[in-house]
Amino acid sequence: MDMKKLMKQMQQAQVAAGKIQDELAAQSVEGTASGLVTVQMNGHGKVTSLKIKPEAVDGDDVEALEDLILAAINDAAEKAEGLQREATAGLGLPGF
């Protein structure tokens, strides 16, 4: 294979990957648990917002609130992973 052609393809892939990273950072997904806890996350999976309704807070049952928070985070993380899969689907790279 021609080295110049290979280098050009690598540069194009780097530009495309940079664009994808920017797009993922700008996108947002939301995960919820029983409507009591809501988590927003960007396309990279970084939590950007956490909302807890007052009725979710029970001093005698902190474990239930912890479970709701985890469920909301995991729900949002699944959606963020979906965005990542969609964004990288056209690259044809294994593991992306």
Swiss-Prot record:
A molecular function (GO) term: DNA binding
Phenotype of the disrupted gene, per the record: Mutants display an increased sensitivity to oxidative stress, and a slightly increased sensitivity to ionizing radiation and UV exposure.
SUPFAM superfamilies associated with the record: YbaB-like
Pfam families documented for this protein: YbaB_DNA_bd
Record localization: Cytoplasm, Nucleoid
Gene3D superfamilies, per database record: Nucleoid-associated protein YbaB-like domain
Cellular-component GO terms for this entry: bacterial nucleoid; cytosol
Disulfide bridge partners, by residue number: none
Keywords assigned: Cytoplasm, DNA-binding
UniProt superkingdom: Bacteria
HAMAP family: DNA_YbaB_EbfC
PANTHER family documented for this protein: NUCLEOID-ASSOCIATED PROTEIN YBAB
Function: Binds to DNA and alters its conformation. May be involved in regulation of gene expression, nucleoid organization and DNA protection.
Complex and partners: Homodimer.
Family in the record: Belongs to the YbaB/EbfC family.
Protein known as: Nucleoid-associated protein DR_0199
Source organism of the structure: Deinococcus radiodurans (strain ATCC 13939 / DSM 20539 / JCM 16871 / CCUG 27074 / LMG 4051 / NBRC 15346 / NCIMB 9279 / VKM B-1422 / R1)
